[in-house]
């Protein structure tokens, strides 16, 4: 698995409830840009429309060697999932406070571009502070153990 981009803020800002691997419909120049790791997914999110899932704000830069028919960097892209997975995700999103965000863009073993999407629920500010405290404590503990050994 060749990881192209990861949205690291997802783990900090949200509690991950479940994850799904989805295919994505891309143009040729978008695939070439992905292979060059020219993608940004900081503000990306997934919406359901007409029993299909669409990813918004996934910025794939224009391929510099492409012809005049280059793609739009922020175009809306369709995600490919099984019908029962789409129904499950759409049912979960109807519940309050649950969002779907792309967490990872990668190429699988067969060379196909995939997006790992996550069903998430937003963390409260005190949860984020708690996570920071726990992370700092682990670092300090590791430093102390390293120094004492």
From Swiss-Prot:
Any GO BP: trans-translation
Keyword flag Cytoplasm: yes
Main location group: cytoplasm
Organism superkingdom: Bacteria
Keywords of this entry: Cytoplasm, RNA-binding
Compartments it resides in: Cytoplasm
Gene Ontology MF: a single term: RNA binding
Keyword field contains Cytoplasm: yes
Pfam (any one): SmpB
Gene Ontology CC terms, in alphabetical order: cytosol
HAMAP family: SmpB
UniProt similarity note: Belongs to the SmpB family.
Summary of the function given for this chain in its UniProt record: Required for rescue of stalled ribosomes mediated by trans-translation. Binds to transfer-messenger RNA (tmRNA), required for stable association of tmRNA with ribosomes. tmRNA and SmpB together mimic tRNA shape, replacing the anticodon stem-loop with SmpB. tmRNA is encoded by the ssrA gene; the 2 termini fold to resemble tRNA(Ala) and it encodes a 'tag peptide', a short internal open reading frame. During trans-translation Ala-aminoacylated tmRNA acts like a tRNA, entering the A-site of stalled ribosomes, displacing the stalled mRNA.
Protein name stated in the entry: SsrA-binding protein
The encoding gene: smpB
């Amino acid at each position: 698995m060749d990881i192209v981009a990861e949205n690291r803020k997802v783990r900090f800002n949200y509690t991950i409830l479940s994850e799904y691997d989805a295919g994505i419909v891309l143009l040729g120049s978008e695939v070439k840009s992905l292979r060059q790791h020219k993608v940004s997914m900081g503000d990306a999110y997934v919406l359901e429309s007409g029993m299909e899932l669409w990813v918004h704000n996934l910025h794939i830069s224009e391929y510099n060697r492409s012809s005049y028919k280059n793609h739009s960097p922020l175009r809306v892209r369709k995600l490919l999932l099984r019908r029962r997975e789409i129904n499950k995700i759409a049912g979960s999103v109807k519940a309050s406070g649950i969002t779907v965000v792309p967490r990872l863009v990668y190429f699988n073993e067969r060379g196909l571009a995939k997006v790992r999407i996550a069903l998430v629920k937003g963390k409260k500010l005190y949860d984020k502070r708690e996570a920071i405290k726990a992370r700092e404590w682990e670092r300090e503990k590791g430093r102390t153990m390293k120094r004492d050994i």
